Each structure stands twice: as C-alpha cells, then as structure tokens.
Swiss-Prot record:
The gene is aspS. The keyword Disulfide bond does not apply. The record marks 30, 82 as: Important for tRNA non-discrimination. Residues 197-200 are annotated as: Aspartate. Belongs to the class-II aminoacyl-tRNA synthetase family. Type 1 subfamily. SUPFAM superfamilies: Class II aaRS and biotin synthetases, GAD domain-like, Nucleic acid-binding proteins. This is Aspartate--tRNA(Asp/Asn) ligase. Its EC number is 6.1.1.23. One of its GO terms (cellular component) is cytoplasm. It catalyses: tRNA(Asx) + L-aspartate + ATP = L-aspartyl-tRNA(Asx) + AMP + diphosphate. Pfam families: GAD, tRNA-synt_2, tRNA_anti-codon.
Amino acid sequence: MRSHYNTDLGISHVGQSVKLCGWVNSYRDHGGVIFIDLRDRSGIIQLVCDPNDSKEAHEIASNARNEFVLIAEGAIRPRGEGLVNPKLKTGEIEVVVSKLTIENESAVPPFTIADESVNEELRLKYRFLDLRNPKLYENFALRSKACIAARNSLANMGFLEVETPILTKATPEGARDYLVPSRVHQGEFYALPQSPQLFKQLLMCSGFDRYFQIAKCFRDEDLRADRQPEFTQIDVEMSFCEQKDVINVAETFLKDIFKACGKEIQTPFRQMQYKDAMENYGSDKPDLRFDLKFIDVIDIFAKSNNEIFANIAKDTKKNRIKAIRVPKGDTIFSKRQMQRFEEFVRKFGAQGLAFIQVKEDGLKGPLCKFFSEEDLNELSKRCELEVGDVVFFGAGAKKTVLDYMGRFRIFLANELNLIDPNALEFLWVVDFPMFEQNDDGSYSAMHHPFTMPKNIDETDLEEISSIAYDVVLNGVELGGGSIRIHKNDIQQKVFKLLNIDEEQQKEKFGFLLDALSFGAPPHGGIAIGLDRLIMLVTGANSIREVIAFPKTQRAQCLMTDAPSPASNEAMRELGIKLRENIK
C-alpha cells in the first residue's frame, strides 16, 4: 500500500512521487494551507495540503484530526529557506499532497502521543496508543535485532533451538510459582515455569549437547523497576563443558547482540571472585564505571582507644571496618551534604558515618583523637590520602556494613557525577557460595540446588563454594549460570543439606534424579535477562519501556484489567470454590 516509510525519505528523493501511510501527529491551518505531521513507526514527515495543488486533498485534510489514519500521495520537495526542522530526520523535505484518503477516524485521544509528562498509569491503560510513539518503537526494533542476533550467533555455534513446556510441575526455585488449575485432574495444578532449568538439563541428558531458547518465564514476586511477573531470557545449556566454555559462548553471543544494536564491546570481560566483589564494593554486582573501592582498615582500628571500634575490630570474621576515600572531597562537600550522607547510610542500618578530613596541617576529625600519630600515619598511607581528601568509615556487622557502604559508594558516585552513562563495563562474578543463611538460621541455595559445588564434603555450609557465575553490566546483573550437578549421589547430598528429605526429593525432583541415573553428561549453562539487556542498551528507565504490554508494580495490566475474577461456571468446571471475604 505504501511506497516508503517516512524516514526512508530525504533530500535525495526530491521530485519523486510517494505514497505514505500513517497517523495525524499534529495539524495546522496556516492561511488556507494545511500542514499535517504524518507519523508512522519510523517517525514524522510533513504533508502540505494546498488548494492550489489539489482542492480535493485540501478539503479532505480540513476534516482530519489527531490520530486519524491517512493515506497520502504526492511529490517530495525541499522545504523553503529557513523552514528546515533539524529535530526531524525528514526535516529538510515535505510532501506536496495530490491525493489524500482518511482511512479511519479517531476518538479524541486521552493524551498527546509525544507528551513525555503523561502519567505512566494512563499510558499503560491506553498502551496501544502509547506504543505509537516512535521512541518506544525504536526500543522494540532494537529488541528484535537483539533476538535475531542471539539466534544467529548461537545457531552458528551449533546450538539447537528447542521449546520447553509452559505448563509444568511446581519446583522450588526461590520465588513463588504461578499455579494453573487443571480441569481434567481436579484439585491438581500446573505451574508456570520460573525458568526452563530442569528441562534444559534433561535435554543434555538426552544427548542434545547444545540447546538454546528465547524463553518466557514467570515469577510471582514483588516487583521493582527491573522486574516483571513474566519476563524473557536467552536460555543456553551445553554438555561436556567447563565454566570457561560457557563464559566464552556467552561473551560471543553478547558481543554479536551489541554489534547488532550498534555498539562494540570488548571481550574477554574481566572476572572477579564473589568474595572480592563483596569485600571491595559491597555488592555481588559492582558497577565498575567508577572507582571508590573499599579499603580494609579493621586492623588499624583494632589499635584505637575507642572502645566501640576496638570491640568491633576484635572479631574479623563477623565484623568489618571499611573506608572509602574521596579525592578532594573535603573541598567539595558542604556540611549539609555530610549530614545527608549520614542520613542516607542510617536508612540501611548504619549507626553513623565516621569520617576524617585531610587538611594542610594533617588529619582532622573527631576520630583522630583515638589514634596514635603512628596509627594515623599508617591509616593515611593505606588510604593514600592527600590534602583535600575526605575518607569515610563504616563499622559493624559484616553483612550490614558491606550493604550500606556498597549503597553509599553508588550514592557518592552519583553526587560526584563519576558515572559515564555511555560506558559499558562488563564483569564476570565467579566462585559464589553454594549456600546462604536465611534470617531464620536455615540455609538455601544461593543460585539454585542444581549448581555443582566445589567442596561438597566441607562441614561448614558457608565455606562450600560453587561453580557459578554472573555476568554484570554497569552494576546490573544481566544473567547468571553454573556448571550443573550431573551425578545422582551429589545431587541427593545437596538436597539433604537443604533439608529436602528422600520423600520430597522423589516427589519434586524424581524425574531429574532418574535422568541423572542414566549416564548424564557434565553440563552447564547460562540465562541472560533479555528485558534487562534491552533496558540497558536503550537507556530506558524501566523494563516496562521495553516490554510491549507490561504489568504495573502491582502485577496488573491496566489495559485489559487482568487479573480479573473468573466466572462461576469456570470455577465450577475447575472444582474450585473461593473462601468468602477473601479480600
């Protein structure tokens, strides 16, 4: 029907006849000549409807309004002197309309498509209108390129695309399952998959060797800016591999994805052990676009005559004292800013925020009186302090200190404008602990219970490490993976350490244990969050901007009003009766 998309046209097309299709973005009547900004998925082009060129087209144009659907035919001409619009890709040209058709009319839209100040809830309610914005379209064009690049890259490396079931069995993977009642087997439920984890392992047991899938996954968890109840991941599994093989494959397809999106990235990515990431940056996904690395000073504080710090420093296993040096910070930060810094860390469990300033005549601050001159010199040397610097200290329980100092590090970087928004800093975090302790004292798998442990015979669960790895970009976890357990006895031992008894093992994972009993090969894999990846590539503020029809932070679709009550008839067929006053 059309000859071109709007932004395919430029000054080189002057004199050509074209046929364009799209929506009225805006409409202006200037002394009898009507100007229409016609919008299609690519962008905007200006139509000129002059009665001297076509009375019929001009008359039809006079009835057009915002969001009417038009088909326009005419000739390209350059805009007049001083009328070029540099904000538009087509800003040097316009279309002199000879024929115009109103293909469909529109009700008055609830908002202007290009208005970025519109409330997000209103945009989501009328998402079909919101998606007419060419800026949003660009996100999905990029997403499509990324998916095509991922498929081509993995296929070139010998991976086979296989779809795994959506209706499956509930298995504990760290979040709540979405359950689907069975009409045929009343009282029983399917679960929507949190990931294809077990099925892709079964494919390795089946000898498929290399699998991938762009998989839809579901998790019933609290939502944040980078989470949705349904999300998409690039899921990969391979047999007869080590960690380095999976990392090489992931770097290859990530490089191809970024190239397709117009960005060049360097491989291999740097690697960092989990314990180093936590001890030096207070995060298992550190943002390395800036420095502000922690400095361990617990041994120096052990020599202070401040009873609080000295007591903290006695237990180097459970406690931490970390410093962050800010070069020239003493010349930058006001007294009010220093107060804000303390208010910030207190929100995350800090008792306060001690600091020392470096003046021309030496170190200054309330802390200094608790140290000998020798200890202050040692502190200055370790922190590499210079005149004008300020150094902040966090002290207390290990988990609390690393958490609030890690958050404070990012807070400082934003305050100091240290973060380059165009930088792409990739990192592999490796050697994760196998288990982590919950608030109630029990243990759970840090990644999942199918990860291969390195030292399974270690008696202290917190000392057992795993062959697990996360890929991080600019402080955001893009995805993670591991080498899997491929031996039945090791898998059962891990289940036992997690207090999953033999009966539960058989009930929940019997099919996996069976598969591991029939010659399962060594295997491992990775999953990359596609939504997060595209969010970072496009610079979007939320994954809602890169998902066509997203849910709100209350897991609702405002456009379709989902979730919604089921009819009584449907509930009877499923054999389900809700409790009264369930809300």
